[in-house]
A protein has these predicted regions:
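Beta-strand-rich binding/interaction modules
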Residues: 84-87, 95-159
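Hydrophobic alpha-helical and helix-loop surface patches within well-folded domains
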Residues: 1-104, 115
Length: 159
């Protein structure tokens, strides 16, 4: 935690896309470059390689040689994929790094594995009321012999 996005945990914490800045040299920070690249990587994970490439192609078609914003990039990803990434924009707007609490349990009799993830984002200077951020990640289950097991989400039963 202290090695990844250390700036996010200190008094200089700021969003990837700050609302304002004192001078442009203040804009070249670890948060903007390192965390910003991780946010782009999460969009890649969320959309998958094909839709991400489609979004990248659209982005360059629209904005080649122009000064752009993160909103231009996200909009191209939305338009190319048909996905609404408005909740994902919080990664650009909020400072701080989400902290996850993970709990898991396996009900052997029912054959059910439960994974519960809770998210909190510590207060940072100027931002105390944080909204949960979308964190894409992949999960899978393996059997005793290392084989992949079918995964069925509890939400699938609600249909």
């Amino acid at each position: 935690r202290t090695a990844q996005f250390a700036e996010d945990a200190g008094p200089m914490a700021h969003p990837v896309r700050p609302e304002s800045y004192m001078e442009i040299t203040n804009f070249y920070t670890l948060t903007i470059y390192e965390k910003g690249s991780e946010v782009v990587g999460m969009i890649h994970t969320l959309l998958g390689p094909d839709l991400f490439r489609k979004g990248s192609d659209l982005y360059f078609e629209r904005h080649d040689g122009q000064a752009v914003t993160t909103d231009d990039f996200v909009r191209a990803m939305e338009d190319a994929s048909g996905r609404d990434l408005s909740q994902f924009r919080l990664w650009y707007e909020q400072s701080g790094t989400p902290e996850l609490t993970v709990r898991d349990e396996f009900d052997d009799a029912a054959g059910i594995y439960r994974l519960t993830i809770k998210q909190s984002i510590p207060d940072t200077p100027g931002q105390t009321d944080k909204k949960p951020q979308h964190i894409p990640f992949a999960i899978g289950l393996l059997g005793a012999e290392g084989e992949s097991l079918p995964l069925k989400l509890a939400a699938d039963d609600a249909d």
